[in-house]
């Protein structure tokens, strides 16, 4: 973490909430942190954006995760290298009116906000459903078509390929997840090929159509209810900034506590981790950052005098430097109190395009300090 960023973080965070922060400090704070978060500018939010419960759940899981890792703790479909999740809603258009049947519908998602350099590791569409009652044929097949080429009126229908197929029980109301990785990967390579996804639902063993309101494919309710039931596209990407770490590196280190306790009284202000809270609301970011509203970043401060106790998590070079400093204080400076381990921070925020992003950022929290 760069020194100038720490300086402005400390200045901004130590400012009382009742006091106004000078505009110059605000500008420095924003210009330093936005690139750190992978953003070119502050998102501009228009209208109400509903945060999916699935992202809230993953955010809470990540914050309570046993290990300190920037990879998202997701099993199965999602690879461990993914450190960013984005959710997208269907882009409504006049084409929607052409799909009059409730069990055949085209979903279109604008994923242009995903940076081209990020690696796609998985993509899924989640569909909510209501329990169907009094049905003699409860099982349905959900066919997912990638639209390779849209149809031409009077000539031919759309050219598609099936990329996923699911059999679901209409007596259950659990969320249905369909894999759309091949389609989204192609869209990222060539945005012009994004013609959407065609979803068709059939009843298995029955001539009549499936229950009309089982799978929720299109808007048919008031906005508050639709926000909770609308289809959502989730993309899982890796921006390449988080290297895979070993189990030893992921576990939080505990300082050694040996016979060095007797040396503590010799240090007037020993090297240790100190409080530093970053308040996003103080710089006006609470309109696009959903969570956290702020976080404990901490910093390292204090003296590293000779002899350096074992619990200071030092190095052999620092021990030698402190020894020489004790003999020649004017010629050689003493070791510095610096972070020896940094942890990740999860952030849930809104994009200017209406998307919701959950991203993990490494090296944002001081976990341990030492003399180096």
Swiss-Prot record:
Does this entry carry the keyword Glycoprotein?
yes
Where is region (Disordered) located?
237-267
Listed Basic residues bias regions:
253-266
Residues that carry a glycan: 110, 134, 173, 313
Record family assignment: Belongs to the TGF-beta family.
Per its UniProt record, what PANTHER family does this chain match?
Answer: PROTEIN DECAPENTAPLEGIC (PTHR11848:SF263), TGF-BETA FAMILY (PTHR11848)
Protein source organism: Tribolium castaneum (Red flour beetle)
Localization, UniProt:
Secreted
Gene Ontology CC: extracellular region
Q: Which domain of life is it from?
A: Eukaryota
Q: Source organism lineage?
A: Eukaryota, Metazoa, Ecdysozoa, Arthropoda, Hexapoda
Task: Report the Pfam families cross-referenced here.
Answer: TGF_beta, TGFb_propeptide
Q: Name one GO biological process term.
A: cell differentiation
SMART domains xrefs: TGFB
Write the protein's name: Protein decapentaplegic
What is the purpose of this protein? Answer: Acts as an extracellular morphogen to establish at least two cellular response thresholds within the dorsal half of the drosophila embryo. Required for the proper development of the embryonic dorsal hypoderm, for viability of larvae and for cell viability of the epithelial cells in the imaginal disks. Acts together with scw.
Question: What is the gene name?
Answer: dpp
Disulfide bridge partners, by residue number: 271-337, 300-369, 304-371
One Gene Ontology MF term: growth factor activity
